[in-house]
Amino acid sequence: MNAPPSRLKFHTDTDLAKGLKALFVELQARLELRDKPIKATIAGGIAVHLYTAQRVTMDVDAEFGARLYLPQDLGIEVPGPGGRSLWLHFDAQYNSTFALMHEDYLDDAVRVPLGVDYFDIYILSPVDLAVSKISRLSANDRGDIAALVEHGLTTAAAIEARARDALPGFVGNVRPLEMNIADAVEIARQAEKRRSTA
C-alpha cells in the first residue's frame, strides 16, 4: 500500500519548505535558467519533512534530470529548532546509486507544487523513500521509516515488497541488506501498531 498521489498532503508552508523553495529559486537564478523546467527528484530527510513536517535537516538530496553545476556557496538560512539558524544546502555528494532504489523510483516520484519556474520538483513516493533508507538504516533513517508509516503513507508489507523487488539492482553485498530489510519491516510493523492505537 502506498497513499495515492491525489491523497497526499505536502507540508509546503513550513520554514524548511519555504527555504527549499528559496534554494531552488536561487539556483535557477545563479544558473540563469530560461528554458523548459528541469526535473529535480528529492530524497532524504527533506522529502520526509515535506510528507510529515517532522524531520529537520540541513542538506538536500536531489537528483536532476540534466547535468548541473551546484555552486559550493549556495545555501539558504532558515529558522531551526530552538531558535538557531540552519544553513540549507544541496548535498553535492548525493548519489542515488549508493542507496537501495527500485528501478521505477523516478517514474513513481510525486510532483510537489513548490511554484519554482524552471525546476519541476518531485519527491520519492513514500514507499520508495522508506526503501531508500534501508541500506544505511541509521537512527535518522529508522525514525524516517517509522514516521512515514505512522502518517499512513505506506505500510510494512509495501516496504518489504518494494525492497525485495529492488534487491536485484543493488550494487554491492546484499546479505547485510537483507538483514536491514528485516529490521526496517519490523520498524514499520511497530509503527503500524502505534498508529492503530493512537
Model-derived regions: residue spans:
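Compositionally biased terminal segments of proteins
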Residues: 1-198
